[in-house]
Amino acid sequence: MKLRKGAKISIVGTGLVGASAAFAIMASGLASDLVLIDINKAKAEGEAMDLGDAAAFVKPLDVYAGSFEDCKDSDIIVFTAGANQKPGETRLDLVYKNVNILKESLPQLLKYCPYAIYLIVANPVDVLTHVALKISGLPSNQVFGSGTVLDTSRFRAELAEYCNVDPRNVHAYILGEHGDSEVAIWSTADVSGIPLKEFFQLRGIPPISREKVVKRVRNAAYEIIQLKGATYYAIAFTIKRICETVLRDENSILTVSGIVNDLYGIQDCCLSLPTIVNGAGREQVLPITLEREEEVALKNSAQILRDVIKQAGL
């Protein structure tokens, strides 16, 4: 699994998320070309200059502010452009603002980058991924969202802390909407192949409070926004991780958001499920077995997203 030679990544939107993602990508050495695009050209230029000053400390990289035309031949387009989520505002409240931004930008990107992988990050990510697929007409492997990859990381971190183990040894998923209706999948959660209940018994750990864990995971972004105004570091690492598995053709299983049909009774809706991600993008969804309550909750999450899409006339 080798890195594509001369990989090019373009980031549309250089707010806190886009700029932090640029930093994470640059530090990782994933790309040889990194293009920053923003409606505020001065902001993009400033971010590019600031990052460029660190050129002596990373692998050779050409980072610069540009236009949509400069995205030509990009391997990945990372779309973070959108209004910020304000305190007390849900991700779904952003739909009207950010759908319009996407509609204005995507046709111009497609003109120069018809073969790129499009990673949608701006919120509400599931709705915007749905819109991007409809507008672009591109195949579903080529357009997908960051989904619940970060939520899954939060879930695993919570379980790891409780179990006092390395988070990388915890396997558990958050599925559905990246937002308030997301679903924690407890039935398949394990620590290095040992089901949680058995692991608790082996280690003499009392049963975990599922409600408290789910609440912390679901409300993490709201709490951070309340404390510091925005979330951007963890999502930056999320973006870097997704780009990494694409550029290195890793066949990693990530809970990215993409179109779902004929699974769990869900039709024509973008949400997150365990998915093989590689050089082709979102290659294959893995339909894991869920308990009845989990499947019902997942269907409910899908219905909430469909209702938003319908209300917005999308």
UniProtKB/Swiss-Prot annotation:
Enzymatic reactions: (S)-lactate + NAD(+) = pyruvate + NADH + H(+)
EC category: oxidoreductase
Tree of life domain: Bacteria
The enzyme's E.C. designation: 1.1.1.27
Pfam family name, one: Ldh_1_N
Listed InterPro entries: L-lactate/malate_DH, L-lactate_DH, L-lactate_DH_AS, Lactate/malate_DH_C, Lactate/malate_DH_N, Lactate_DH/Glyco_Ohase_4_C, NAD(P)-bd_dom_sf
Signal sequence, start to end: none
Pathway given in the UniProt record: Fermentation; pyruvate fermentation to lactate; (S)-lactate from pyruvate: step 1/1
Catalytic residues of the enzyme: 178 (proton acceptor)
Entry keyword annotation includes Signal: no
GO cellular component, one term: cytoplasm
Record: residues binding NAD(+): 17, 38, 43, 82-83, 121-123, 146
Binding site for beta-D-fructose 1,6-bisphosphate: 156, 171
Major localization class: cytoplasm
Positions carrying Phosphotyrosine: 222
Regulation: Allosterically activated by fructose 1,6-bisphosphate (FBP).
Phosphoprotein as UniProt keyword: yes
PROSITE patterns: L_LDH
GO molecular function: L-lactate dehydrogenase activity
Keyword list, A-Z: Allosteric enzyme, Cytoplasm, NAD, Oxidoreductase, Phosphoprotein
Binding site for substrate: 85, 91, 123-126, 151-154, 231
GO BP: glycolytic process; lactate metabolic process
Role: Catalyzes the conversion of lactate to pyruvate.
HAMAP family the UniProt entry points to: Lactate_dehydrog
Assigned protein family: Belongs to the LDH/MDH superfamily. LDH family.
Protein name in UniProt: L-lactate dehydrogenase
Organism: Desulforamulus reducens (strain ATCC BAA-1160 / DSM 100696 / MI-1)
Organism lineage string: Bacteria, Bacillati, Bacillota, Clostridia, Eubacteriales
Primary gene name: ldh
